[in-house]
């Protein structure tokens, strides 16, 4: 929360102008060159938030806890998007998700059994989020910033169409495979392990446990630590620890990728030391090509599996 709040504070002047544009007041911003108007962007954010809050309220969740849950959810998504955009990691997952905070932190006694059950379902879209739209789209917008306005808007429309087709196609595929072959015969995580986690979390909420003040206290300590790390980095150029790593350092995904990050850092240092900035700039195309090639091979084997009816060609799943 502090990580996101500090970012919003730094951009407060820009965000204030965005809000003025939404209200139709005079501002210092011109959105003619953006992929969409600021009014459309803010309207979408508000409508989406109200819809999600209304969905939880309709399911019997108290209004206050619904608002708090969506606030935490959007804060986590925003923070992870910044981590992906600034650090360059391909995927990341939050160590603490909104459902765990509400159920295990605030406790089932405070939020109620119905809310705990509803929030446990939030694991589906708010916990297992190694790849999520905000992070992917943020990188996509960075890649197209050199295009003209018309081309950028075409790409944005293509992204929206891809999202809709992906939703429809994935839902159909899951249902078709589940009814035809049986979900238990498919991915153990999605059809066995993850539903078990959701069920156990919901049952824990039904126990009506009190608020976990010790855990909330450690949350406060983490907030103070983030403030200190950010302050030290801004005041001392020699400080080696970037605060962007603090919110994700206990994520299991980091355990998988830390050596790759370290290895990439070593390569970058060597290129800059012996080749300079010019060589580093030219070398980026090569390393981007490695990433594209890796994903192309994965997608290619997926097509081969579909055409031949074979399985067991693993795709990088993180």
Annotate each PLM feature.
Residues 1-318:
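Alpha-helical multipass membrane-protein architecture
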